[in-house]
Amino acid sequence: MSVMRSKKELIQSTVRIGVLCCAGLLLGGLVGLCGDASTQGFVHISMIDNSFSPPLQRIPEGSTVLFKNIGRNPHNAVAVDGSWSTEKTYGDLVMGPGAETKVTYPESGVFPFYCTFHATPDARVGMVGTVVVGDVEYEQAAEKKQEAVKEWSGKTRKVPSEYPTIQTAVDASNPGDMVLIAPGVYKEEVVVTTPSLIIRGEDRNKVIIDGEHVRGNGITVVGADGVALENMTARNAVLNGFFWTSVKGYRGSYLTAYNNGDYGVYAFDSQDGVIKHSYASGSPDSSFYIGQCYPCKAIIHDVVAEYSALGYSGTNAGGELYLINSVWKHNIVGLAPNTLDSELLPPQREAHIYGNIVADNNNIKAPYIGLSWPSFGNGILIAGGLRNDIEKNVIINHPNNGIVMLPNLQENFWLSHGTIVKENVIRGSGRADIALVGPISMGNCFSGNSYATTIPFGLEFANGCDAPIRTMMGGDLSMMLGALSMMMDAKLGNLESGDYKTQPVPGPQKEMPADEKEKIQPAFAPFEAHQYLLKSINFHPEAEEYLKGEHGSSSYVGSMQPVVPSGFLAILYHIFGFLLPFVVYSSWTFTALYDMHRQDKKSPIWIAAILVLPFLGSGAYHLSGQSSLPGWYRKTMLWAGAGVFLTLVIIAAALVL
């Protein structure tokens, strides 16, 4: 009889908890429906990285458009005819992440517009859009694109002996021409729309494109396939040093990009490319970036990235994408393939990270933007990525993790699954040499790595790459809460970013060899032409030298220590977000079992529920009236700890989302 009563009470308590949860969800939904009325009645155009959504918007005469930057890069919107711009209403040409402004259109007409940072001024190629106002006819014109060519045309246009600026030489060129630049400091911003050009400096260290911190990009290649940029330096741009966007076929070699305000060497919405023998540093986003492409069919080989927020960032990029035999050091994080909703083609997937040296990525003086700060102190970080491959890398001296896979949150919650981690050497990690972070992880495998610690324990044993079955595992929630606290610090301005304008100036970099200078070739099918780089993947030639250097031993404390750097919020969320639930679980479970013992209750159903269902079983026992503890005591015990935890989560969500 007592067993039947226990069953009934258990069911009633569980139903009661379920009803409360549903009520909470309903209340949350009602609050969400209320929304923010401040943007009602306006047509919206979102600025994504790097496109407008929607690209064509029709509105009645006299209507208003709300432009909002939901990406990570700075953007703007400027009418081709100059009749309006977001600069006039926003007050600044640069609209950073989250910025918004309204533009009203009192008269009918067709208004093509463009982003001055990511498109050509005629709104023909790149980040462009159109607003059609009123009842007017509009049919989008089809532009005839120039075709790329395979070979050099035989024509070389020399700067400055024949053309006073790089831009005038580029504008005069036909597909397949070479623009050869003599040593000098060129204070200009170059936009390339002609395919298959070879733009080369005579001396890598003496041919310098200087943005003087007032011009957007060093060289931008917009919609022009097959353009090669070689043997020169770009510095002090407001945005990017060398930038290809919306192209098929690109090559960058013997490039130096330093102290630019967004990226160093950047390929976006582009396929079939190679970046090699290059150096980039001092960028608040990343030194090297390949983004929004699938399949990318791209190779980054023999590059050095340092003094940036991210050595490499590959948002929504993958599919035959290879990052090989390069050095990533002295950044906030070494390499960080990631998924974000603010760019197209999510999720990030199928990148191959082979034979790299990833060292000392804990540079607190590096420049950064808010989203990059939570990745501090990690070597290789996969944020919401799928089916990536990490092999034969040397990863040393990181205060948090050597290799870490964690979820990423923007509009959607992206988990990291299916990563292969094999034959890496990891040393000197502050939390774990290899770590899984988040509530759940599936399909990741680990084999043949040289390491000291993992979180959770026994990753290679439970999920070997040759095992027929891989175990579904939870991860390090402490790291996830620590990253959340660091994101809050960035949002609140609690941390001062390093200034990209004052990062260390690199010394002379390796010149393009004479035998390579004899080859003049557009970037026609460069991915196929560089397949020889992928035939044999080995450790980096300098791997032994790095391993002989000084590096600390990996920590065995793991999840019990806060993330680094441990500010006030990191410690607060570690104690009350990570450790407190263990205390709450222990107190609920112990008091329930102790109360049953004191009352001499021997219900196997309640005992099983308390032990097998964490929180739910013991919570149901105390709420059902089974407990003899005073009501005030039970309520305090049940709601105090849970209330503190939920309060912290709500505060974090309000600040971050």
Task: Describe the role of every protein-language-model region.
Residues 39-61:
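N-terminal edge beta-strand
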Residues 44, 95-146:
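Extracellular/periplasmic metallocenter environments
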Residues 52, 59, 148-187:
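Acidic Gly/Asp/Thr-rich repetitive segments characteristic of extracellular carbohydrate-active
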Residues 75-81, 85, 158-164, 183, ...:
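Right-handed parallel beta-helix/beta-spiral solenoid domain characteristic of secreted/periplasmic
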Residues 91-92, 414-417, 427-555:
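Acidic, glycine- and Ser/Thr-rich low-complexity intrinsically disordered tracts
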Residues 186-192, 204, 210-218, 238-244, ...:
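Short glycine/acidic-rich loop motifs that flank beta-strands on beta-rich extracellular proteins
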Residues 581-588, 604-625:
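Hydrophobic, aromatic-rich membrane-embedded alpha-helical segments
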